[in-house]
Structure formats: structure tokens, C-alpha cells
Amino acid sequence: MIGLISGQVQYLMAPTACVMTTSGIGYDIELPLPSFCQLRLNEQASIWTHFHVREDAQLLYGFIDRKERDVFRQLIKINGVGAKMALAMLSAMSAAELKMHVEQESETALTRIPGIGKKTAQRLLIELKDKLKNIEVDNSNLEFAIQPAPISAEDSIIAEVEGALMSLGYKEKEAQQAIKAAKSNGETFADTQSLLKATLQQFQSFK
């Protein structure tokens, strides 16, 4: 099983990164947005991975923090929660935030995640309580750290953010609305990562 990949980041298109190891092999890895936002093109990265096998594909999911991978693995053990939903959950909030919301039994916080309704949120709160209690996550900063990778064209940045949100289950209109709200105060974004962070924060105020 592939558990950790270290190498140079060759390609970034949210939520996928391609990392080439010293052996010359490039691995396509799907990451939750907080982890994706910490990668920088052409720089070295070490990514904890989960190898996921389906009938039609073999996929790698990656995480900067090993504990985040531990949370992902607990999520996909729950009936009805596939890898895509688990990735969406860890994109909408950090592992620390998810654990906090579960401990506080915050149903509203979970229903903000695409694809999770009230009944699903209630079930997740019950099942995750025991699954996450023994996982120690970093609570020192509940907002993920951003190390921006410079991208020049604003239209390209917006298109990439919109595509990333839609791939995680948000509707096109929802993605566009959140991006518009993030830019409403006149702030400009020089990189994809900072706009992603600002846009994700907007979803917290929509519900």
C-alpha cells in the first residue's frame, strides 16, 4: 500500500496535484482543499496517502497532515459516506473543525457541506463521536494555513476555484455566488489558494 509520497509538485489543478518522485514516477493525488492550498508548484512536498480501489479506477487521496488522513479513513468506514463525500467534508472544514463540531453536536455545521442533509448529519454525529474521540488533531489553529502559489490571470483563478467547488458537490450557481461574495469588498486575489479560502468561508454565512 502507498502510504507516503515525497517529491516535486509538477501540476496543480484543484483538487488534484501531480507529484513526481525521485524515481521519475508521477502520482496524481486528490486532496481536500486545505491540504491542496499548502502545495506550491515546482516545490518539494510530502503527502500522506490513502490508496482507494474501485471497480473502474485506482485512486490516491492525499493529506499534508497524517491525522487528517486518519479522520478520512474513519469517515469512509461509515455506511453511505464514500471517498468523494469524505473529501468534501474535509474541504469544507479542517479535521480539527470537524472533530469540534462532532463534539459539540453541531448539526447545522454539517448540513453546510454539499450532499449532507439533516438526517445524514444526525447520523454522522452519532457515528463519528466514537470514531474520532481517540484521534488527536491540531487545535492550535482551526483555519488552515495558506502558502500561496502565484497565478497571474484572475479569470483563470476564478475558473479553477469554481471547478474545484463543483467537483466537491457544490452547484455552479452556489459556487459563483460564493466567489462573488468573496470578491464583493473589492479585494483582489493573486492566487487560487487565497480565493479558495475566502470562498469556502462564504459558505459559512449562507445557511
Curated annotation (Swiss-Prot):
This protein's domain notes: Has three domains with a flexible linker between the domains II and III and assumes an 'L' shape. Domain III is highly mobile and contacts RuvB.
Annotated organism of origin: Psychrobacter arcticus (strain DSM 17307 / VKM B-2377 / 273-4)
One GO CC annotation: Holliday junction resolvase complex
Region (Domain II): 65-143
HAMAP family: DNA_HJ_migration_RuvA
Role noted for this protein: The RuvA-RuvB-RuvC complex processes Holliday junction (HJ) DNA during genetic recombination and DNA repair, while the RuvA-RuvB complex plays an important role in the rescue of blocked DNA replication forks via replication fork reversal (RFR). RuvA specifically binds to HJ cruciform DNA, conferring on it an open structure. The RuvB hexamer acts as an ATP-dependent pump, pulling dsDNA into and through the RuvAB complex. HJ branch migration allows RuvC to scan DNA until it finds its consensus sequence, where it cleaves and resolves the cruciform DNA.
Family membership: Belongs to the RuvA family.
Subcellular locations according to the entry: Cytoplasm
GO terms (BP aspect): DNA recombination; DNA repair
Record key words, sorted: Cytoplasm, DNA damage, DNA recombination, DNA repair, DNA-binding
Pfam families: HHH_5, RuvA_C, RuvA_N
Region (Domain I), start-end ranges: 1-64
Region feature (Flexible linker): 144-152
GO molecular function terms attached to this record: ATP binding; four-way junction DNA binding; four-way junction helicase activity
Quaternary context: Homotetramer. Forms an RuvA(8)-RuvB(12)-Holliday junction (HJ) complex. HJ DNA is sandwiched between 2 RuvA tetramers; dsDNA enters through RuvA and exits via RuvB. An RuvB hexamer assembles on each DNA strand where it exits the tetramer. Each RuvB hexamer is contacted by two RuvA subunits (via domain III) on 2 adjacent RuvB subunits; this complex drives branch migration. In the full resolvosome a probable DNA-RuvA(4)-RuvB(12)-RuvC(2) complex forms which resolves the HJ.
Main location per the UniProt record: cytoplasm
Disulfide bonds: none
Protein name, entry field: Holliday junction branch migration complex subunit RuvA
Region feature Domain III, mapped onto this chain: 153-207
UniProt-listed NCBIfam families: ruvA (TIGR00084)
